[in-house]
Regions:
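Flavin-dependent oxidoreductase catalytic cores
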Residues: 1-129
């Protein structure tokens, strides 16, 4: 779209008149982002931010009122306990992209370790060494 601010701003205003429950964007938080503009145009419609958010990005968006909620996509695939990891500021598992699309391999979807499993495994290895 040549004029995303105007197009999506207008659409959001019209949707707001119809009392939608929320609006959700998948947009990078960079200089060209229109999320803040859309938030201003949304009136009282709650905004859910998403798109490669770090823990710090999410906290900033929520604490500054730039979003009412945040969501995570890919990080939930590789971190079944993402909420706990974010609360504890713990490291995240890296997503294995090679197994995501077009394979019959379950590996990389359901076998990522939780934080407790990762810590237990590390302690076991450290004990054996």
């Amino acid at each position: 779209d040549e004029n995303p601010r105007e197009t999506f701003g207008y659409a959001l205003e019209e949707l707001g008149k119809r009392q939608i429950a929320f609006f959700f964007t998948r947009e990078h938080l960079d200089e060209g982002s229109i999320s803040s503009y859309l938030k201003e145009r949304s009136g009282s419609v709650p905004y859910i931010a998403n798109m490669k958010l770090s823990r710090e990005d999410a906290i900033d968006l929520l604490e500054t009122g730039k979003a009412e909620a945040v969501s995570f996509g890919k990080n939930y695939i590789s971190n079944p306990d993402l909420y706990e990891r974010l609360v504890q500021n713990a490291p995240l598992n890296e997503l294995i992209f090679d197994n995501m699309i077009g394979t019959d391999v379950a590996e990389g979807y359901i076998d990522y370790p939780t934080l407790i499993e990762s810590v237990d495994a590390k302690q076991t290895v450290d004990t054996l060494n």
